[in-house]
Regions:
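Repetitive helical segments and hydrophobic/amphipathic motifs
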Residues: 12-13
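C-terminal motif of bacterial Sec signal peptides marking the signal peptidase cleavage site
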Residues: 17-21
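Bacterial N-terminal signal peptides that target proteins for export
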Residues: 1-9
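A residue-level marker of the well-folded mature domains of exported/periplasmic proteins
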Residues: 22-361
Length: 361
């Protein structure tokens, strides 16, 4: 993949926000399925139109809304029609219903953040048999269910980054826990497995992973799971939440219960939601966290879909394609034997830069 320096990514993020603001996607939900459909403005992209669909994990998640905003921005540049669907719940069943609806509509492509690695295969393979181009984005599906995967960052890189954060924040020893999304979420599961692999190194020997809890990417359930962890493990030192919903819920619990100086927090979070909780003192629970720009993830997903539809790529290793303001990307081999396009490395947010980014996304 062509390397891009952080300053380029940051300029892209700022440009995205200037175009779309810091809110969610611009579509209005209609119907029981939560479909948002918008017709993009005329553009000068070689794809020359097309209908591009995005199915996110679930509704009510600001991360998903910003990802959808980036998707719609790119489709507008491509001169096509964007259809965004947000399932009511983060389940494979809700997504299967939406896939079938999109197949019936005759869309040109479907990009999906999978709620289950394998359960979507019958519906997605049926879509591909109809000539619809299918890619996964943000959360993967199996290799038979996609042509390529738009990945935020490499799984091993995320696992190493988060594990090193736990090691640093804990002082190198003690109990820690993970607060994840759903137990079927392919992306979180891959990151957690990578963290466990990293933990096999001797330098992590004094750290004890006591539990992986699941908040299902629902705020209240994530609050409940955080409270349960605190009750079950009074000696807990660190919670790592590789989910934007989970980290925000955990931060609120630690603040409300006066535990910000006792139990520390790290993971993946949105700067706009976590700014009040990031700091180096006992009044702040999160010394630092990581993420990428979800607007860029959605933006790259749309350009990937367009390249598949136009035939510029098939999803094979070493194919390259332009992705608007983000530049050129190269398809690489994924850990599961399929292929992927990686947006870029995770970025660290701490007390020194959070004010700079909290108004961006």
């Amino acid at each position: 993949m062509k390397k891009r320096v952080l300053s380029v990514l940051f300029c892209a993020a700022i440009t995205s926000v200037l175009l779309f603001g810091c809110g969610g996607s611009s579509d209005d939900s209609t119907g029981d399925s939560g479909t948002g459909e918008s017709t993009a403005a005329d553009g000068n992209a070689e794809a020359g139109g097309g209908t591009y669909a995005l199915i996110t994990k679930a509704s009510g998640n600001p991360y998903n809304e910003k990802e959808a905003a980036g998707f719609e921005e790119a489709v507008a540049e491509l001169g096509g029609t964007a259809i965004v669907k947000h399932p009511e719940k983060a389940t494979a069943e809700d997504q299967i219903t939406m896939i079938n609806e999109l197949v019936a509509q005759g869309v040109d492509s479907i990009a999906i953040a999978g709620n289950d690695f394998d359960a979507l295969q019958p519906a997605l393979t049926a879509a591909m048999e109809k000539g619809i181009k299918v890619s996964s984005v943000d959360s993967n599906v199996n290799t038979d269910s996609r042509q390529t995967f738009v990945n935020q960052a490499g799984n091993n890189e995320i696992g190493q980054t988060l594990m090193d954060a736990v090691l640093d924040i804990s002082g190198g020893e003690g109990q820690w826990a993970i607060l994840s999304a759903t137990s079927q979420a392919a992306n979180q599961n891959a990151w957690i497995e990578s963290m466990k692999t990293v933990m096999e190194d001797d330098k992590y020997a004094d750290l004890e992973l006591v539990e992986v809890a699941y908040g299902d990417d629902e705020y209240q359930k994530s609050v409940d799971q955080t409270q349960a962890l605190l009750q079950k493990y009074p000696d807990l030192k660190v919670i790592c939440a590789p989910t934007t919903v989970g980290i925000m819920a955990a931060a609120k619990v630690l603040q409300d219960e006066g535990l910000s100086g006792t139990v520390k927090l790290t993971g993946l979070g949105l700067p706009s939601e976590m700014a009040d909780y990031i700091g180096d003192d006992d009044d702040h629970s999160c010394p630092y966290m990581y993420l990428w720009n979800p607007i860029d993830v959605g933006y790259l997903s749309a350009y990937t879909s367009a390249a598949l539809v136009s035939g510029d790529i098939t999803g094979a290793v070493d194919e390259t394609f332009p992705a608007g303001k983000l530049g050129e990307y190269t398809i690489t081999e994924a850990n599961d034997g399929g292929t992927e396009v990686i947006v870029g490395p995770p970025f660290k947010f701490d007390s020194g830069n959070i004010d700079e980014w909290k108004d961006v996304y």
